[in-house]
Swiss-Prot record:
Keyword Amino-acid biosynthesis annotated: yes
Binding site for (S)-2,3,4,5-tetrahydrodipicolinate: H135, G144, T145
Protein name as annotated: 4-hydroxy-tetrahydrodipicolinate reductase
EC number(s) reported in the record: 1.17.1.8
GO cellular component, one term: cytosol
Lineage, uppermost ranks: Bacteria, Pseudomonadati, Pseudomonadota, Alphaproteobacteria, Rickettsiales
Taxonomic source organism: Rickettsia felis (strain ATCC VR-1525 / URRWXCal2) (Rickettsia azadi)
Catalytic activity line of the entry: (S)-2,3,4,5-tetrahydrodipicolinate + NAD(+) + H2O = (2S,4S)-4-hydroxy-2,3,4,5-tetrahydrodipicolinate + NADH + H(+); (S)-2,3,4,5-tetrahydrodipicolinate + NADP(+) + H2O = (2S,4S)-4-hydroxy-2,3,4,5-tetrahydrodipicolinate + NADPH + H(+)
Membrane spanning stretches: none
Amino acid sequence: MINIGLSGSTGKMGKTITERIDKFKDCKISAKFNSTNNLDDLDNFCKNSDVIIDFSTPEILEKLINYALKHNTKLVIGITGLQPQHFKLLEKAAQTLPILYSANMSIGANLLSYLARKATKILDDYDIEILETHHRNKKDSPSGTAIMLAETIASEKGLNIAFNRGNRPRCEKEIGISSLRGGNVHGIHEISFLGDDEIITLKHEALNKNSFAIGAIKAAIWLQDKSPALYSMQDIYNYSLKKQL
């Protein structure tokens, strides 16, 4: 039985993971951490967990990593809004621990990333734009998923990523990200490939948070026998595909 520690347990993702964990017979939630806890509580939290799923806030990440290193506790990080210094912490810790980071844990969003990479190779002379839509209370903009998609596409074509063009026209070697906020939208991501004569759009819409929660739990299970490294959800799906072939 895999003991999963849940960080951010009182948030929307934490509650959804708690609801979905019973679908998995080989793991259980052994410890919880949320905003009512003291940061020093992370010591016992990590000690009582084989792996931690973290959907809290960037502010606790450094402390969480330090205690995870102390107790050799694996990490699944789903926090968005991370800054370059946070990724440096993850990369350094991943030399000692297996860590999986993803801005989006759902299979659909990661399939969208895969398809976008393939389409980018084929549609070489098309302009590419991303539109992401989320609920009115989402704090970060653009979304972590939109950035993930843009970075995937940009790496294929050597493009710059434009978050806010202001009053200037579109540059030739760039991919733009636009954001909408409103309502109770769980997440919509559209990638448009715009040619002179046609437009091709790839779209993923999350109807609820279940797919994110299930993906995070699967990531925690998958990570159990992995060597120290910084993994992504793409590693899980590539690994699963290879096992089937």
